[in-house]
Amino acid sequence: MASDRQNLQDAFLNHVRKTKVPVTIFLINGVKLQGVITWFDNFCVLLRRDGQSQLVYKHAISTIMPSQPISLYEGEDAS
């Protein structure tokens, strides 16, 4: 049963990718990146801004902050 559930990280990234919500990504060295997440996997995130793409490795990411409030598992039982 537990394996049927998507982990929080994947659910969050998939939601902001599908809805094209702009995000701010803070790296562990303090750099701030902004754009829209277009793709992700277990190791990296593809961030797009002004027609340019940046491949960002997850181990370098400190925080991902969406530009607007998001609701995960809308309409589903989150328990």
Swiss-Prot record:
Task: Specify the superkingdom.
Answer: Bacteria
Gene Ontology BP annotations: regulation of DNA-templated transcription; regulation of RNA stability; regulation of translation, ncRNA-mediated
Report keywords, A-Z.
RNA-binding, Stress response
Q: How does it assemble?
A: Homohexamer.
- Its biological purpose: RNA chaperone that binds small regulatory RNA (sRNAs) and mRNAs to facilitate mRNA translational regulation in response to envelope stress, environmental stress and changes in metabolite concentrations. Also binds with high specificity to tRNAs.
Entry-linked NCBIfam families: Hfq, PRK00395.1
Q: Which HAMAP family match?
A: Hfq
- Protein name as catalogued: RNA-binding protein Hfq
- Organism (species): Roseobacter denitrificans (strain ATCC 33942 / OCh 114) (Erythrobacter sp. (strain OCh 114))
Record gene name: hfq
